[in-house]
């Protein structure tokens, strides 16, 4: 595993891997977060003005598979102590996306210049958490093997609407042999707060994916002849919904570049 360092922290007392990961992001020394800080929960990010926060919270409650909330800030507060005492939502991800009227207008490495006192941050569970459990059972995770971002796709599966928020579910994909796919269903069912069991196996066209080799987000990965694509609900769904709703202003993470928290993956297992 690559060791990440942040200027000013060399020689310090031993630091949690999750804290080291955030410091590296803060210093611009992390290019992606898949496989980073093993054992620690990573999260998707959606930041909205206070006047839209209640509707978005309701949207997440009505769509728990793609949008399981694991943390939420107070209005105007960039800290979420339940996820990490030193955590700063404005600086601690490798890259962000800034949205205006449904269009992405910037992709900065921090959002200090975009932060406002009326913003509320939502952190949504990420499938990277259950990947640790899959790998512990010796199931292959292709995007980690290839050193790329997980492929993600917009689907024809409609989310339940809430206020201005409505749109398609986004899914992440991992290719597996059929017998391994069955085992993956069993393993990931234990993690409902990070998307849980798959929403679809095989036949990508039946959920509106026209070309499996051209993901809408992330990077394509190899699918071997004896494998099938396995699809999980994905926390990038809010980005598709924010774009569809054309909200005046929002901030999200850049797909595949997550917030590393101090929560342990094992804390999220229900069995």
Curated annotation (Swiss-Prot):
| Entry's EC annotation | 4.2.1.-
UniProt-listed SUPFAM superfamilies: PSTPO5379-like (SSF160920)
InterPro entries recorded for this chain? Answer: D-Glu_cyclase, Putative_hydro-lyase, UPF0317
Question: Keywords on this record?
Answer: Lyase
Q: Does the keyword Lyase apply?
A: yes
| GO MF terms held by the record | lyase activity
Under the heading Gene3D superfamilies, the entry gives:
PSTPO5379-like, PSTPO5379-like domain
The protein's matches in HAMAP family, at most eight in alphabetical order, are given as:
Hydro_lyase
Q: Which family does it belong to?
A: Belongs to the D-glutamate cyclase family.
**Cross-referenced NCBIfam families, in alphabetical order?**
PRK05463.1 (NF003969)
Protein name, please? Answer: Putative hydro-lyase RPC_1666
């Amino acid at each position: 595993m690559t060791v990440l360092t942040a200027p000013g922290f060399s020689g310090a007392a031993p630091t949690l891997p999750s804290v080291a990961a955030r410091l590296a992001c803060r210093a611009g020394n992390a290019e992606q977060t898949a496989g980073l800080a093993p054992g620690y929960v990573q999260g998707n990010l959606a930041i909205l003005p206070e006047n839209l926060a209640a509707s978005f919270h309701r949207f997440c409650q009505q769509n728990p598979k793609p949008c399981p909330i694991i943390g939420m800030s107070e209005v105007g507060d960039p800290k979420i102590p339940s996820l990490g005492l030193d955590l700063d939502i404005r600086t601690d991800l490798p890259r962000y996306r800034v949205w205006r009227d449904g269009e992405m207008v910037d992709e900065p490495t921090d959002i200090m210049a975009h932060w406002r006192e009326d913003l509320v941050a939502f952190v949504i569970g990420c499938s990277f958490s259950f990947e640790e459990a899959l790998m512990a059972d010796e199931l292959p995770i292709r995007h980690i093997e290839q050193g790329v971002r997980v492929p993600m796709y917009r689907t024809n599966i409609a989310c339940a609407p809430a206020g201005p928020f409505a749109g398609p579910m986004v899914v992440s994909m991992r290719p597996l042999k059929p017998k391994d796919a069955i085992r993956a269903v069993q393993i990931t069912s234990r993690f409902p707060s990070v998307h849980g069991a798959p929403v679809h196996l095989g036949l990508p066209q039946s959920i509106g994916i026209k070309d499996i080799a051209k993901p809408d987000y992330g990077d394509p990965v190899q699918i071997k002849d004896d494998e099938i694509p396995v699809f999980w609900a994905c926390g990038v769904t809010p980005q598709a919904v924010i774009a569809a709703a054309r909200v005046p202003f929002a901030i999200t993470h850049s797909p595949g570049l997550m917030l590393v928290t101090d929560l342990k993956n094992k804390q999220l297992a229900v069995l």
